């Protein structure tokens, strides 16, 4: 094996070791290790199952801690072992040994990159589940169809990530597609990954609804906000909330809703509107709507504290050119993020939920 390649293996091991040590400091390995010991001890106590909710929270925390602690332990041990073997193989001229070390180093690299990616989640709500609101904008039937394509795209994205996705509200379009929908996505760092998807998404294509085959431009907006739990206190003055009930829309049939079971809540001071119609009763829809309102208000206050607050309802009331984040030009096989300038040509792959290249670029650039 040539000297240049041998030296490169050594340099690679040094680089990976330095990055691992930096991650141990940044991710506060020692504190997480001690916390993991405490959590494991609690889960081993049979009494913990007397409170299933608490046990579930501990199980979730253990999974998150394991991902950091066990990975850092593996990296530290294996990099040290490989560094020792490298010196021995280098002295003995053991090419097979050096080749093995080279391969092992490349196996460890993605583990480091995954932990480094976690460093970009600085928002306190990043680890939480999230809601994704989709709303058709300018473009009529074409926009409603585009909104339904985005609904499918984010359901596919959740599937790729191993997240649980539930369509909690869906309002069909007059001709095709949807006017609006809300997805609940449950998984580790669901909000952190998807929060930069908030904004207007533009579609340019030859419309299947236009017999002349003309190109149409349409818009749909996304609004992503975290699901907050009961441990976060959000005080809402009931007099600030207007409640409207209406008949849930649907395809009909024997289960068609003949009562005003759908609920819409409007928080008057902020203009935030949430709605729910999927439950069979007004009571269940009201409970879900209030949960979403609490989540929306938490997100609103958090953004204001971080001096990042924007007019949150702009993405719903002005779904057009001015708020675009991504452009999908299907005829030219081009999807471009207008904030990061990341551009891809594999349009169907993206529409099938492969959004990682856009999301990672947004997080890395601090969008």
Swiss-Prot record:
It is found in: Cytoplasm. Methylated by PrmC. Methylation increases the termination efficiency of RF2. Keywords: Cytoplasm, Methylation, Protein biosynthesis. Gene3D superfamilies: 3.30.160.20, 3.30.70.1660, Release factor (1.20.58.410). The modification N5-methylglutamine is found at residue 254. It comes from the Bacteria. GO terms for molecular function: translation release factor activity, codon specific. InterPro entries: PCRF, Pep_chain_release_fac_I, Pep_chain_release_fac_I_sf, PrfB. One of its GO terms (cellular component) is cytoplasm. Its main location: cytoplasm. Peptide chain release factor 2 directs the termination of translation in response to the peptide chain termination codons UGA and UAA. NCBIfam families: prfB. Belongs to the prokaryotic/mitochondrial release factor family. This is Peptide chain release factor 2. The lineage of its organism: Bacteria, Pseudomonadati, Pseudomonadota, Betaproteobacteria, Burkholderiales.
């Amino acid at each position: 094996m040539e000297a240049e390649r041998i030296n490169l293996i050594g340099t690679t091991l040094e680089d990976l070791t330095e990055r691992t040590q930096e991650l141990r400091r940044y991710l506060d390995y020692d504190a997480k290790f001690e916390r993991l010991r405490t959590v494991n001890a609690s889960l081993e106590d049979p009494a913990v199952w007397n409170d299933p909710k608490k046990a579930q929270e501990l199980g979730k925390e253990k999974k998150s801690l394991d991902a950091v602690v066990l990975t850092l332990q593996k990296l530290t041990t294996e990099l040290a072992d490989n560094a020792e073997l490298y010196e021995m193989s280098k002295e003995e001229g053991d090419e097979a040994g050096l080749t093995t070390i080279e391969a092992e180093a490349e196996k460890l690299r993605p583990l480091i990159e995954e932990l480094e990616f976690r460093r970009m989640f600085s928002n306190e709500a990043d680890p939480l589940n999230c809601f994704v609101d989709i709303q058709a904008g300018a473009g009529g039937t074409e926009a409603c169809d585009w909104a339904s394509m985005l609904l499918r795209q984010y359901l596919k994205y959740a599937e790729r990530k191993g997240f649980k996705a539930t369509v909690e509200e869906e309002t069909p379009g007059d001709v095709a597609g949807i006017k609006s929908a809300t997805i609940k996505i449950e998984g580790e760092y669901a909000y952190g990954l998807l929060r930069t998807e908030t904004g207007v998404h533009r579609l340019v294509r030859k419309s299947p609804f236009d017999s002349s085959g003309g190109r149409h431009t349409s818009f749909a907006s996304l609004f992503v906000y975290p699901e907050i739990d009961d441990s976060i206190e959000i005080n809402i003055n009931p007099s600030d909330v207007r409640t409207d009930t209406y008949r849930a829309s649907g395809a009909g049939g024997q289960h068609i809703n003949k009562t005003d079971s759908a609920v819409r809540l409007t928080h008057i001071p902020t203009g935030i509107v949430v709605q729910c119609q999927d439950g069979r009763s007004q009571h269940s829809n009201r409970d879900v709507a209030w949960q979403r309102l609490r989540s929306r208000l938490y997100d609103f206050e958090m953004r204001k504290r971080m001096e990042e607050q924007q007019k949150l309802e702009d993405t719903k009331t002005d779904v057009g050119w001015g708020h675009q984040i991504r452009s999908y030009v299907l005829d030219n096989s081009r999807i471009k993020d207008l904030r990061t300038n990341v551009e891809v040509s594999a349009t169907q792959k993206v529409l099938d939920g492969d959004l990682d290249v856009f999301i990672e670029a947004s997080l890395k650039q601090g969008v």
